[in-house]
From Swiss-Prot:
Pathway: Cofactor biosynthesis; molybdopterin biosynthesis. Belongs to the MoaC family. GO terms for molecular function: cyclic pyranopterin monophosphate synthase activity; GTP 3',8'-cyclase activity. SUPFAM superfamilies: Molybdenum cofactor biosynthesis protein C, MoaC. The active site is at 127. This is Cyclic pyranopterin monophosphate synthase. NCBIfam families: moaC, PRK09364.1. It comes from the Bacteria. Substrate binds at residues 74-76, 112-113. It holds the Pfam family MoaC. Catalyzes the conversion of (8S)-3',8-cyclo-7,8-dihydroguanosine 5'-triphosphate to cyclic pyranopterin monophosphate (cPMP). Keywords: Lyase, Molybdenum cofactor biosynthesis. The keyword Heme does not apply.
Amino acid sequence: MKLSHLDEKNHPKMVDVGDKNITSRIATASGMIYMSQEAFDVIKNNTAKKGPVLQTAIIAAIMGAKKTSEIIPMCHPLMLSKVETDIMEFVKECAFKLIVTVKCEGKTGVEMEALSGVSIGLLTIYDMIKAIDKSMRITDIVLESKEGGKSGKFVRS
């Protein structure tokens, strides 16, 4: 399989999407963060010294999706039409699951924007609570689904 981000001399390049059709693109990614009971309670009770953790993580996830092309070298800048987030609590596991869905009308997909949003959102939780629990674990950052473009639809099974 030939990688599209490498030229004939094996040098990195940004893929030319100029001839592609503009289509509706949507992608959803998710990830988990596990923590101590104390850290989980601080977040749930909204008593973190740095402020409202989950609300800040949502804003960070949106910013992370929007800034993807600035931090991942071969990503194209995209005009996003939607970034939607959801956070699920897992009380028994002392964990949160962050889900980010990104949409645009464009010539390339938004998978990296969804994955970046999840990553930055979870890193923000870690940053805001690390004084309480440095052993937090960020895991299972995955693409859940994507639609649009030549490669069609993908849904994680």
